[in-house]
Regions:
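Tandem CBS (Cystathionine beta-synthase) repeat/Bateman regulatory domains
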Residues: 1-430
Length: 430
């Protein structure tokens, strides 16, 4: 049943034409319209544009039925090349994540066809494995990982229904929707508070525009992410004014509290640490493990001031083939990264238009002196959700000083827009 479901989705993805006009600013009146928006100011631009414009450019949802196993969900993430999958169930039998009631309805009759009960990402799946990794400690064939063992009976762990891991990560606790007529400014408020993605109905049954909703019924939904909004900002840089030329330090866009792992940290321990801190990525730093006695969890509090060499993220976890999970989770982060890179180079995974073909991933960093425009360009071009802030010269070149996430980018752009708007009102009223 699941294979038929998955194949039907993949065929739909292959046949669907990706409409990129909304993300690249075409089809909205040309230069004269752009000039009008520029005169309206940054806040005016972000208030005028609606999330449905971006959502229409997105492909169909990647989803799995509530009966799918964790192995099915992991394969769907890999095949669809997405960070999260929605979980669908028959209507009337479930309470959605966070008490949500998001229903796909029949376009002709309005009758409910399916209920989206939550989202699951690879970190949710691997967290489930990590948390239950000590259940089989008495098994003589346990795989040693230096600080805890992945379960020997991985097949049993991966055969549980995907619905059982909804909400394992902080992001999965609630399933959000945005009304299609929500302005980008209001969307950015939601996305600047830690919400990474939300469902957007292309048509809504709700009369009143409420930016964030837990109840919705619509024939078609699309997934809108923080990256979609950042790409919009990149494509419309000329309309955003001076905020893009301001520095990371000036805008307060960086957080200096950074957790990190050593390259020799075991993957299973890194996953536990990421789950405990609600992180989807951590920097990997060049430091000997014996310099930090105890487990990796003691080390990760010492990230600032160490030389960052690469990133360990949910994307790496997603690209780990299910068949290799047992052996790869016991490897060090550095070994795991090498294995994933080799798997990508082999072209063993199917390609889809949402992301570019596999290529060696380079470190994506910035400094406190980098402009916001440079940060947005790097994030969008490299499809990364955070840039590590490093020192840029001398003996301290490459030392970790902080992190700028997409959440930070959207927060400071929104704050700049509202600040500019207040100044304009003060001038008019004076």
């Amino acid at each position: 049943y699941f294979q038929n479901w998955q194949m039907a989705q993949l065929r739909a993805f292959a046949n669907e034409q990706h409409q990129q006009e909304a993300l690249h600013g075409h089809g909205h009146g040309g230069d004269s319209d752009s000039n009008k928006k520029a005169r309206a100011g940054l806040c005016g631009v972000l208030r005028e544009r609606k999330v449905v414009e971006l959502a229409r450019a997105k492909r169909r949802l990647v989803e799995v039925p509530y009966t799918a196993t964790l192995a099915n969900a992991a394969n769907a993430l890999l095949a669809g090349r997405v960070s999260a999958v929605t979980v669908a169930a028959p209507p009337g039998h479930w309470i959605g994540a966070g008490g949500s009631l998001i229903v796909e309805s029949d376009p002709a009759t309005g009758a409910a066809r399916k209920h989206y009960i939550g989202m699951v990402n690879m970190l949710d799946i691997l967290t489930h494995i990590a948390e239950t990794g000590h259940d089989d400690d008495d098994d003589a064939s346990a795989v040693k990982d230096g600080g805890g063992s992945p379960p020997v009976d991985l097949d049993r762990r991966m055969s549980v229904p995907v619905s059982s891991v909804i909400g394992h990560s902080l992001e999965g606790l609630t399933l959000w929707t945005l009304h299609p007529n929500t302005s980008l400014l209001d969307c950015m408020e939601t996305f600047s508070k830690g919400v990474h993605r939300a469902l957007v109905p292309l048509e809504s049954s709700a009369d009143n525009v409420v930016a964030v909703e837990l109840v919705e019924s619509a024939p078609v939904y699309r997934m809108l992410t923080q990256m979609d909004v950042v790409r919009f900002l990149r494509a419309h840089g000329a309309e955003l004014g001076g905020v893009l030329s301001r520095t990371v330090r000036e805008l307060g866009a960086a957080s200096e509290a950074v957790l990190a792992v050593a390259s020799r940290t075991k993957v299973i321990e890194a996953i536990r640490t990421m789950r405990a801190a609600s992180l989807t990525a951590v920097p990997v730093v060049d430091a000997p493990m014996d310099a930090y006695p105890g487990t990796a969890a003691l080390f990760v509090r010492q990230g600032r001031g160490k030389k960052v060499v690469e990133t360990f993220s949910a994307t790496d976890l997603r690209d780990c083939p299910v068949a290799q999970l047992r052996s790869w989770l016991g490897a060090s982060v550095a070994e795991f990264k090498d294995k994933v890179a080799e798997y990508r180079r082999d072209g063993s995974r199917p390609l889809d238009a949402e992301e570019e073909p596999p290529r060696p991933r380079e470190m994506v960093t910035c400094s406190f002196q980098s402009t916001l425009g440079e940060v947005i360009e790097k994030a969008a071009a490299s499809h990364v959700h955070r840039l590590w802030v490093v020192d840029g010269e001398g003996e301290e070149e490459g030392l970790l000083r902080g992190v700028v996430s997409l959440t930070d980018v959207l927060r400071v752009v929104r704050e700049a827009a509202l600040g500019e708007d207040r100044e304009l009102h003060d001038i008019v009223s004076s």
